[in-house]
């Protein structure tokens, strides 16, 4: 047989030239054990803390939290029943990223930002890390713009500013969520103006709540036309603990998009007690050492790194803001427990809601003495300052006198007058759910209360008086409301008109 070397070498050259090396290199690990939503994985030596990993063949994702010498502790974002010992785990080489942007407005998403409202995929969004470092000192400025809640007791006595963190704390069933919903609904007239520098986009995050509760809340927002400028993030009680742990950070990242683009956002965390419980569950299952109340040692950092991301940015940094309203549920009014004291120390003030007040029909059940805003009147318009300063003092004196009068048999006229005025002011601060008032209407109502126009009215008629007064103002007194809204203060000529209206209305109401 005739062998031709030249021909063979040509064939070899062609083979070598046409050889195409296609290979995919992926770092993998192996499941050592699985149980209670925790997977122990061998391998993945270069995995990052907080990195997303994927379990091959199941599509299930997890997050690497414990990086130990011989294995990695992974928490699962779902049910791990389909995972078996020996399964392959793949690195994604990315830390948890969530969708942000205006495309989320009006949508309901889960703890990772995936839509769960059945309205198709998200559009007009970009992706950001769920956990980022909070802004430093220099990019911030002090809180100066009011964030109106529409609730008289809060806007007058415990004012909240844009960029502030105000804790809402109280036992279960005291109206904590109602305050959040009212605040979101109260932004409708502001957002209707369409001014991006004034609009306030709202994000509500439900942690560990019933699905039926979240569905009712979404329905309420839709009924009041508030869903169009709101995002609901829901990590319900049936979701895995890592989803409940992550949901507040996801919501915060969504709010930061607005803050960093010179807009204003509000994030309502309902509630951080359940997030702490979910984190405790994960930490104990990962065998991290427990501390007080079995919480891990870094549970303070869990909440501080979240709430520090709320800020009012300086004008050089766009002047945007992110306001935080975290909620903490107490057990039998015990505000000295571990998580309540932690969050009280992190926030810029707190609104205490009391069961006793709630059952006495004083709703919202705000304990005025125990509630405080560390931003104070810097977060109020001048008109509100003109009427609110007096109401604080009168309510404080009323509480003192009411306690004293229980033991005194006969009271002098001045004390009796103070008690009567206080009782009427308490009635005046009552407000039904989902009926927030614009700030100019609040100012007029409180003006009537502090200047003695409500004193002749019987205590049980005060609520009816207020409703009738507001109706009168929206009709005959609309110019007064417009003047207060535009001037942001009660000018002498406006005050003259207001006094005339209140005197005439008082006579008609009492007749």
UniProtKB/Swiss-Prot annotation:
It is found in: Cell inner membrane. It comes from the Bacteria. Its main location: membrane. Its EC number is 7.1.2.2. GO terms for molecular function: ADP binding; ATP binding; proton-transporting ATP synthase activity, rotational mechanism. PROSITE patterns: ATPASE_ALPHA_BETA. Produces ATP from ADP in the presence of a proton gradient across the membrane. The alpha chain is a regulatory subunit. Belongs to the ATPase alpha/beta chains family. HAMAP family: ATP_synth_alpha_bact. NCBIfam families: atpA (TIGR00962), PRK13343.1 (NF009884). This is ATP synthase subunit alpha 1. It comes from Gluconobacter oxydans (strain 621H). The gene is atpA1.
